[in-house]
Regions:
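Extended hydrophobic alpha-helices typical of membrane-associated regions
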Residues: 315-404
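Topogenic membrane-insertion module of multi-pass membrane proteins
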Residues: 12-84, 88, 229-242
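Functional transmembrane core segments of multi-pass inner-membrane proteins
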Residues: 204-275, 293-296, 329
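Acidic (Asp/Glu-rich) catalytic motifs at the cytosolic membrane interface
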Residues: 91-115, 264-287
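Small-residue-rich segments of transmembrane alpha-helices in multi-pass membrane proteins
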Residues: 65, 203-218, 379-390
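Intramembrane alpha-helical segments
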Residues: 117-229, 235-242
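Membrane-embedded alpha-helical segments that form the functional core of polytopic membrane enzymes
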Residues: 74-102, 171-186, 247-269
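Multi-pass membrane catalytic core of lipid/isoprenoid biosynthesis enzymes
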Residues: 112-169, 283-319, 379-391
């Protein structure tokens, strides 16, 4: 793709459209970012906000909402621990975005021929090194924000949740998962082996912005499991039990897989849009390595995974595959009356997002890298992730409360 401007490289702020000429001669008109039309401090402030990519922050909020809904079955919420955890998730997403902004520009992925919104490092508003440092600082703050849950800080139990200053036993599962999430957020495009440049972006997003995020959110609310506090066991054994309990929570795994799959679909649309410029910068995403046809099938498959896994909630709700206190699955066949009484909203509510998923699939099939409709498809994929995750959270919370009333 060759960029052609009617003005010099740094176009005047009044110019609202950038003309791009593709390799086949087609011309796309990419709208300039709104902050580029501003001047002075207003432009700087707007660029700071744009650098955080506010529209992407739902990728941090949705796993927290789903994990919070799962925690409804564990007892009263622990908001003094959960609210800092939400702040940690948001800071982690912002830090990942800033590091991505700086590193993609440094490595040439965000060059003059880039499609999509203008990045602040690419536009020269801020030095890439400073953007990188701000991203690292956000990731450090994200780790610090998990301290109340990691240290099990005690509070008085009132709705306001005033901390008493007492520290409980260190929750090693929270420490390990938070540290690994921060490292993954940085290593996505930072460090000596950027995961996003080696076709590992979707895998990273699925694990850390899906499964791990949901598990951490639930754990922040529910606190340490009682069976991990065996006074006769060593501290190391209790820590291992704690980590196993958090990672082997089947409900959190399934919910995390659903939200993670749609976050991956969002990333796959983004990589399809940028496939041409990524290939030129040797950023080997799955769309670059296996082609655009594969990327389109990948988007469909990831969306299908999220909806197919909804059956899990129906099966566990009616009693098929339920686990007893000993962790062993039950095998009793549910009666028709039981099925009617235990209908799962967690399995049906997300189905309201099916039309949106079909729209994303139809749009993605018609896309080619750099096409002017790529950003609209990306917005639709983000809306799907938000709608599906919100409906799943509401359904899980409803099922948990219904089950508590039946108990």
């Amino acid at each position: 793709m060759r960029q052609r401007r009617s003005a010099p490289a740094r176009a005047e702020a009044r110019d609202e459209v950038v003309t791009l000429e593709t390799a086949d001669g087609a011309v796309d008109h990419a709208p300039r970012a709104s902050w580029e039309n501003l001047r002075g401090p207003s432009r700087t402030l707007a660029a700071c906000v744009a650098a955080t990519r506010p529209k992407s922050l739902t990728a941090a909020v949705i796993p927290f909402a789903v994990g919070t809904s799962l925690a409804c079955a564990d007892g009263p919420p622990r908001w003094p621990h959960a609210v800092p955890a939400l702040a940690s998730f948001v800071l982690m997403q912002i830090g990942c975005n800033l590091v991505n902004d700086a590193c993609d520009f440094t490595r040439g992925a965000d060059g003059p021929n880039r499609t999509g919104p203008t990045r602040v490092s690419q536009a020269g508003v801020f030095r890439a090194r400073n953007v990188h440092l701000c991203g690292a600082a956000c990731l450090a703050l994200a780790a610090a924000a998990m301290a109340p849950a990691a240290l099990d800080l005690q509070y008085d139990g009132t709705p306001g949740g005033v901390f008493s200053g007492e520290v409980g036993e260190t929750q090693w599962s929270v420490v390990v998962l938070t540290a690994s999430s921060v490292l993954a957020a940085y290593a996505y495009t930072g460090g000596p082996y950027p995961l996003g440049y080696h076709a590992l972006g979707e895998c990273t997003v699925f694990v850390f912005f899906g499964v791990v995020a949901v598990a951490l959110a639930r754990r922040a609310h529910s606190g340490p499991p009682s069976r991990c506090h065996d006074s006769d066991a060593s501290a190391t054994l209790r820590a291992l039990r704690d980590l196993r309990h958090t990672l082997c929570d089947l409900d959190a795994l399934v919910a995390g897989a659903q939200t993670g799959a749609l976050a991956c679909a969002l990333l796959a649309v983004n990589n399809l849009r940028d496939a041409r410029s990524d290939a030129a910068a040797k950023k080997n995403t799955l769309a670059v390595r296996y082609g655009t046809a594969f990327a389109k099938r990948e988007i469909d498959a990831l969306m299908a995974v999220a909806f197919v896994l909804a059956w899990y909630w129906w099966l566990t709700r009616v009693g098929v595959g339920e686990r007893g206190d000993d962790g062993v699955a039950t095998t009793n066949e549910p009666s028709s009356r039981t099925v009617a009484r235990r209908w799962s909203y967690a399995s049906t509510a997300p189905c309201l997002a099916v039309p949106l998923a079909l729209s994303v699939s139809r749009r993605a099939r018609a896309l080619e890298p750099g096409h002017k409709d790529c950003d609209a498809t990306l917005a639709a994929a983000a809306a799907l992730h938000f709608a599906f995750g919100g409906l799943l959270a509401l359904g899980v919370a409803h099922d948990a409360k219904t089950k508590a009333r039946e108990a």
